[in-house]
């Protein structure tokens, strides 16, 4: 009976050792997973930090563009005023061009068909 108790004790010892090894392996696997998750979290946190830096840079860039845009608005207003003046000048030039064309036509007509005679004292007499 002592032998069977020794065998039983040895079997139980082997069982406990095996269960202990299995639990230890499971815990080591879980620990490895946790280490991997920690490394992944650190990597993701680093990526988010980089994205935050990029976003901050973009915000500064957008603010600079907005301030430059405000300066450009003044020039755009000046360009609009100049464009309006140019349009007004073009309208005046068009009126003057038509007036000059009418005068040229009258002068050509006068040279082709003179209606006036000149006296010796340069006064004009009409027919």
UniProtKB/Swiss-Prot annotation:
It comes from the Eukaryota. Transmembrane segments: none annotated. The keyword Iron-sulfur does not apply. InterPro entries: BLOC1_su2. PANTHER family: BIOGENESIS OF LYSOSOME-RELATED ORGANELLES COMPLEX 1 SUBUNIT 2. Belongs to the BLOC1S2 family. This is Biogenesis of lysosome-related organelles complex 1 subunit 2. It comes from Arabidopsis thaliana (Mouse-ear cress).
């Amino acid at each position: 009976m002592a032998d069977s108790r020794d065998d039983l004790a040895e079997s139980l010892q082997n069982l406990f050792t095996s269960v202990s090894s299995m639990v230890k392996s499971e815990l080591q696997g879980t620990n490895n997973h946790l280490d991997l998750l920690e490394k992944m979290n650190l990597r993701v946190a680093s990526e988010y930090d980089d994205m935050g830096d990029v976003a901050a840079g973009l915000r500064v860039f957008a603010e600079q563009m907005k301030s430059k845009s405000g300066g450009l608005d003044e020039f755009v207003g000046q360009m609009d005023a100049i464009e309006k003046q140019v349009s007004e000048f073009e309208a005046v030039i068009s009126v003057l061009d038509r007036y000059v064309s009418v005068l040229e036509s009258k002068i050509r007509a006068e040279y082709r068909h003179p209606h006036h005679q000149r006296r010796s004292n340069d006064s004009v007499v009409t027919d």
